[in-house]
Amino acid sequence: MARLRLTLAYDGTDFAGWQIQAAGGGRTVQGCLEEALATLCGQPVRVHGAGRTDSGVHALAQVAHADVPEHRAGLPWGKALTALLPKDVAVTEARLVAPDFHSRFDATGKEYRYTLWTRPGHVLPWRRPYVWDVGRYGTLDVAAMEACAGLFVGEHDFAAFQNAGTDVHSTVRRVWDVSRLAGTGPDETVWRFHGEGFLKQMVRNLMGALVAVGRGKATAEDVATLLAAGDRRRAPGTAPAQGLCLHAVEYGAPGVAGLPGLGDKPAEPAGSTT
């Protein structure tokens, strides 16, 4: 068998998440990919993903691996798979790798981005599946949100920001950066969450806390107390799935990827008039 590494982009709107569900559980990215690989290989193929994105969450660069028969190794995998996959999934890179490569266990970092729609009034219809409409809450206190974001940087026990339903050995995670970027237009703001790894719905829970602070429903001191206490029951609500995108999965030296690239720029400091 030959090990194949895939980089995938997908629109999570109509998926029940990455991971295959029980019978009747809905359409999944993993399921679509395994069906396409089985067609090309003539046998069942198991796919392993770097992250298990939830229903409605998008990906720009999810990474997965699969073992394919040696006699099929020379196929133009990216083109062949994309031709078989539904229109809301694309293979952006495909290459053969060492047989011990593991998309999940070899990952040294991940970057997620969350997009907020900040203009009061209606969200543009074609943006609604990709943003959280916080404009309906009025103007957010961005300076307070940025001050709160600093609390999440470093190594912490994020038990208060993990949703139930996951059995993990430890809830301690190391986060390198939580920062605000310029959005794709004047009505949007993008937040970057960059770290070694994240707990179940942790990024959405962090975003929910930041918006609560921006709305004046909580303070940075409240969030600091919550982080120290580790009690999810006292935490603000979870941000909706559609604003979240898995932007990058990193391998090799930790923390060196996921930095601003082409088309990225930091947001203006809170209160800036430029």
UniProtKB/Swiss-Prot annotation:
Residue positions of the active site: 54 (nucleophile)
Annotated binding of substrate, by residue: 112
Entry keyword ATP-binding: no
SUPFAM superfamilies found in the cross-reference section: Pseudouridine synthase
Pfam families referenced in this protein's UniProt entry, alphabetically: PseudoU_synth_1
EC number: 5.4.99.12
GO BP field: tRNA pseudouridine synthesis
Major enzyme class: isomerase
InterPro entries xrefs: PsdUridine_synth_cat_dom_sf (IPR020103), PsdUridine_synth_TruA (IPR001406), PsdUridine_synth_TruA_a/b_dom (IPR020097), PsdUridine_synth_TruA_C (IPR020095), TruA/RsuA/RluB/E/F_N (IPR020094)
Record bears the keyword tRNA processing: yes
Keywords: Isomerase, tRNA processing
Reactions that this protein is recorded to catalyse: uridine(38/39/40) in tRNA = pseudouridine(38/39/40) in tRNA
GO molecular function: RNA binding; tRNA pseudouridine(38-40) synthase activity
Highest taxon of source: Bacteria
Family from the record: Belongs to the tRNA pseudouridine synthase TruA family.
Quaternary structure and partners: Homodimer.
Function: Formation of pseudouridine at positions 38, 39 and 40 in the anticodon stem and loop of transfer RNAs.
Official protein name in the record: tRNA pseudouridine synthase A
The species this protein was found in: Solidesulfovibrio magneticus (strain ATCC 700980 / DSM 13731 / RS-1) (Desulfovibrio magneticus)
Gene name in the database record: truA
